[in-house]
Amino acid sequence: MNFKGYSDYRHDTVARIGVLVASLGTPEAPTASAVRRFLASFLSDPRVVELPRPLWWLILHGIILRIRPSPVARLYQSIWREDGSPLLSFARRVGQSLQAELDSRGRSIEIRLGMRHGSPSIETALEELRQSGAQRLLVFPLYPQYSGSTTGSTFDAVAQVLSTWRWVPELRMIAQYHDHSGYLEALAETIRRSWKEAGRGERLLISFHGLPKRYLLAGDPYHCQCQKTARLLAERLGLKEGEWQIAFQSRFGREEWLKPYADHLLQAWAEAGIKRVDVVCPGFAVDCLETLEEMAQRNRELFLHAGGEEYRYIPALNDESAHIRALTDLVEQHIQGWSEADLGGGREATGQAAERSRQRALALGAKQ
């Protein structure tokens, strides 16, 4: 096997810290063919669907990829923006804002965005970090609550890429940040602002992406971390019991998923006489199909049709300044102990040390 190395390595290269900001991914276009490619990649991940591979291959290729791409493409068409996929657009802005915030704090750190499925890929992002001289790598999946199907899958993808490298970097990963104070306060700020601008509903629905219940029973901590996030957020907002409720959305298939289901709960509230609700989705760092179409559009129609009168979706944190500060704090927390090009005497001193290293290497026969 040919491993990727530094055939043109310069011995005055300053080791840098690289941060891979990772997200799930998105189709490249709101078309059936693009959605088919995305679903084929996403649903082939054994972390996402834990079924025997031969059986699942038959279901996926014999049924799902034949009937689902067209209707899912229509859903994407309802939220597609001039600059493309909302998830990709917002994730890029998060990456750019995170880079700017780190720069403003005097950090010499390279940020790259990589998608688990689709483009820009994790492999491409890691290669760009390698070419920039990143010898210390922090993997930052934008999933506040850990699940094997998301964060675990990201680690698998990173490990697969690094297995092809000759010089593997030092590696760390932010596995979850569901109870981080900056993250919780950023969420609380967006909700308070919504209440101030448009009034407060009778109930706050705190909705997370669902998972099959058997994943919880198998030891996945996702459900517990969602519960903790919701409880801590409600406490920050001063909400009493009965003024808020956690729920889980986006289920597919026939098996039991985490409950209560968001659509069932919203319908029950409307039928019970609840007229005004606010909805927030703390598990989504950026807005995407599941928030903009499912929660902001489809479940709004369900609630109003069942007798509700006001339904307000509160957007994801996206590139809100409080969110970016929280993410930057997390990066700084997790790189403690790693030196940077602007530490240990500053950039000039570091550059001088690198040049001395190069001169010693040249004396030993190095090319550059």
Curated annotation (Swiss-Prot):
Catalysed reactions listed for this entry: heme b + 2 H(+) = protoporphyrin IX + Fe(2+)
Function, as annotated: Catalyzes the ferrous insertion into protoporphyrin IX.
Keyword Glycosyltransferase: no
Organism expressing this protein natively: Nitrosococcus oceani (strain ATCC 19707 / BCRC 17464 / JCM 30415 / NCIMB 11848 / C-107)
Residue span of region Disordered: 341-368
Binding site for Fe cation: H209, E290
Name of the protein this chain belongs to: Ferrochelatase
Keywords: Cytoplasm, Heme biosynthesis, Iron, Lyase, Metal-binding, Porphyrin biosynthesis
CDD domains membership: Ferrochelatase_C, Ferrochelatase_N
Source organism superkingdom: Bacteria
Pathway recorded for this protein: Porphyrin-containing compound metabolism; protoheme biosynthesis; protoheme from protoporphyrin-IX: step 1/1
MF-aspect GO terms: ferrochelatase activity; metal ion binding
Single GO biological process annotation from the record: heme biosynthetic process
Subcellular location: Cytoplasm
Family stated for the protein in its record: Belongs to the ferrochelatase family.
One GO cellular component term: cytoplasm
Gene3D superfamilies, per the entry: 3.40.50.1400
Group of enzyme by EC: lyase
EC number: 4.98.1.1
Predominant subcellular localization, coarse grouping: cytoplasm
Pfam families: Ferrochelatase (PF00762)
Keyword hit for Iron: yes
